[in-house]
Amino acid sequence: MSDQVMPTGQNPALQIRNLDFFYGDFKGLKNVNLDIAQKKVTAFIGPSGCGKSTLLRTFNRMYDLYPGQRAEGEILFHGKNLLEKSQDVNLVRAKIGMVFQKPTPFPMTIYENIAFGVRLYQRMSGSAMDDRVEWALKKAALWGEVKDKLNQSGLSLSGGQQQRLCIARAVAVKPEIVLLDEPTSALDPISTAKIEELINELKSDYTIAIVTHNMQQAARISDYTAFMYLGELIEFNETGTIFMRPGKKQTEDYITGRFG
């Protein structure tokens, strides 16, 4: 079924072609094909275990951290296949940043949470680093809340602030793509609303791919939505079409709560 899903848009940020993914001998993704549009929000929805987070983690090869996992096919980024072993995965992850389900600030100051990643890829003066930290925190709509306590621990922040700190950390290295794996599932409604507002602002500068279990969230913030089930991409289209005029019965059943 997945091989029938055509890519959308022109000059995509990522092109996924004939992608399979394996956990040992188990096939977790089956022939996934789609394009991720530049400077748009693409949401991945589907029941638990459908492969949406697995797919997201292939985009910057996070699976390399786990023995026995492998991907086959192509993920094209500027015309080069990210799955080739010759790719420098550290550079891939600099260009394709990731924010996880639970806030994961480093056990260091707010300032160092931002500066640490930047130093891995760039040499700059102290004043330039100060500017980069401020820039990243402003991008994550956090500067006004933390500018007077940059030397305090990132762990001292609230859950919602910690997640925005993680977003600031991701954008500080100036990626092209930001991956968000259920970034609000551990947050309260007010913090969730702030993250959603932030995502809407960030897409003017970054391509964003988000996994969410919250269909209303996907409908609110995304331009494109992909519905996945049992490792297959069942349907992919503009978000309004997916939610108002789905082309597949499985999609309709899922978004109307009749799935199963």
UniProtKB/Swiss-Prot annotation:
Record field: catalytic activity: phosphate(out) + ATP + H2O = ADP + 2 phosphate(in) + H(+)
Enzyme class (EC, first level): translocase
Enzyme Commission code: 7.3.2.1
A cellular-component GO term for this protein: plasma membrane
Sequence ranges assigned to domain ABC transporter in this UniProt record: 14-255
Alphabetical GO biological process terms: phosphate ion transmembrane transport
Known partners and oligomeric status: The complex is composed of two ATP-binding proteins (PstB), two transmembrane proteins (PstC and PstA) and a solute-binding protein (PstS).
Family according to the record: Belongs to the ABC transporter superfamily. Phosphate importer (TC 3.A.1.7) family.
Protein name: Phosphate import ATP-binding protein PstB
Organism of derivation: Thiobacillus denitrificans (strain ATCC 25259 / T1)
Gene of this entry: pstB
